[in-house]
Amino acid sequence: LTGGNGDYPNVRGTFTGLTLDDDQGALWRCVLEGIGYDYMEITDRYRKAGIDLTQLTITEGGSRDELWNQIKADMLDTKVVTLKVAGGAVPTNCIVAAYAAGDIPDLKQALQRQLEIKATYIPDENHTATYRKAYDKRETLLKALNGAL
């Protein structure tokens, strides 16, 4: 599954490789992996630019699902960390605003509570290798679909 990819503007979304044995769970996993392949493209570009991605901290709704977090760790070949307070930007902005208003005396202490680790996901080398091979096949498919549309 893919869509919204800048390199292939004509490709909107496809499910490929499905059989009659695949169920709704397989389709949901396709959705997650499709997003993950787009993440792979982005993180590959970051790494080529010299940005260190040995650990990613995931926040908001996407941090609440264990399977999704493990898929991200495997696909991106990086340690993924989730936080006990998954809210991300909104609660952090509220803390900064409360500090600015004088309601919180110690900004650093308040923010550190936001950074307590909930879970850590380590990439599985076998899964990472499988995703990398599939990613290369995906590139071939995207080029073909982009040219056909």
Across the structure, where does each feature detected by a protein language model lie?
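Glycine/Thr-rich phosphate-binding loops that ligate phosphate moieties of nucleotide
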Residues: L1-L149
